[in-house]
Amino acid sequence: MSGRGKTGGKARAKAKTRSSRAGLQFPVGRVHRLLRKGNYAQRVGAGAPVYLILELAGNAARDNKKTRIIPRHLQL
């Protein structure tokens, strides 16, 4: 009783995380949730957590005098 009729219809696509869409190994969904729960702003855009992660990683790379972001910079 899926409600798609006899032909079957389209099945739902496999879930894809926002981290994989952004090409990051960092939890974009978790950062977004924390931005919303932390009362930083009334509304938080979909790209805000991705930008925040990359901005902080870029700052860490610059502090280490590197021009390329590596996974270690995401952790710092």
UniProtKB/Swiss-Prot annotation:
One of its GO terms (molecular function) is protein heterodimerization activity. GO terms for biological process: defense response to bacterium; defense response to fungus; immune system process; killing of cells of another organism. The modification Phosphoserine is found at S2. Signal peptide: none annotated. Phosphorylation on Ser-2 is enhanced during mitosis. Phosphorylation on Ser-2 directly represses transcription. SMART domains: H2A. Keywords: Acetylation, Antibiotic, Antimicrobial, Chromosome, Fungicide, Hydroxylation, Immunity, Isopeptide bond, Nucleus, Phosphoprotein, Ubl conjugation. The modification N-acetylserine is found at S2. InterPro entries: Histone-fold, Histone_H2A, Histone_H2A_CS. The keyword Calcium does not apply. It comes from the Eukaryota. The modification N6-acetyllysine is found at K6. Residues 7-19 have a biased composition (Basic residues). Residues 1-23 are annotated as: Disordered. Belongs to the histone H2A family. Core component of nucleosome. Nucleosomes wrap and compact DNA into chromatin, limiting DNA accessibility to the cellular machineries which require DNA as a template. Histones thereby play a central role in transcription regulation, DNA repair, DNA replication and chromosomal stability. DNA accessibility is regulated via a complex set of post-translational modifications of histones, also called histone code, and nucleosome remodeling. The nucleosome is a histone octamer containing two molecules each of H2A, H2B, H3 and H4 assembled in one H3-H4 heterotetramer and two H2A-H2B heterodimers. The octamer wraps approximately 147 bp of DNA. This is Histone H2A. It comes from Acipenser gueldenstaedtii (Russian sturgeon).
